Amino acid sequence: MLTIDIHTHIIPEHIPDYTKKFGYGDFIHLDHHKPCCARMMKGDKFFREIEDNCWSPEKRMDECAHHHVDVQVLSTIPVMFSYWSKPKDCLEVSQFLNDHIAGIVAKYPKKFIGLGTIPMQDPAMAIKELERCKQIGLAGIQIGSHVNDWNLNATELFSIFEACSKLDMALFVHPWDMMGEQKMTKYWLPWLVGMPAETSLAICSMIFGGVFERLPPAVPDHGADGPVY
């Protein structure tokens, strides 16, 4: 029996400075300030420090062997979703990230499965990128627990879920942009409280909003902090 870790985030080692390119916003880029580590920067603000296992598939395979994990399912770090940005700019970021993951999967097909990201704030554009994700060998997509002001039962989003079903693409829902974050500045509360709350918001919106009733049968599976369909 294979041991598969479905919740593993990855980003490219080098990311364009989209804030400078597009002229607005706090897009993520990396500051490689020392060997084997980098600072994730939101515009000019520090976000998080990461190690090389966040971008190196070879380092990941070594760690997987140590922990007896056979396969990792790769998805981007949710802060990269960029749903707040202009759709065409979000599409460019998404395609860059999706091509990166697809390249790793193509190079190590027995070790990695890939999930894409799409510009959910523009459903028509999102579906086109979803179709492209299928073409380049990704197994599904990762989406946020909400899309700006839309919860996941929003009628605007249903066509995306319908397209996932028709294309047989998995849907991994990951909490992000946590509610009440301004009140939770200590004790890692955005992760300990905000992420479970966002997950509840997402799954309840889909259940009570009748999303599953309108789609072919699906079995939700709750991972570390996000349901998979």
Q: Residue ranges of each PLM-predicted region?
A:
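Helix-coil boundary/capping segments in enzymes
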Residues: 1-229
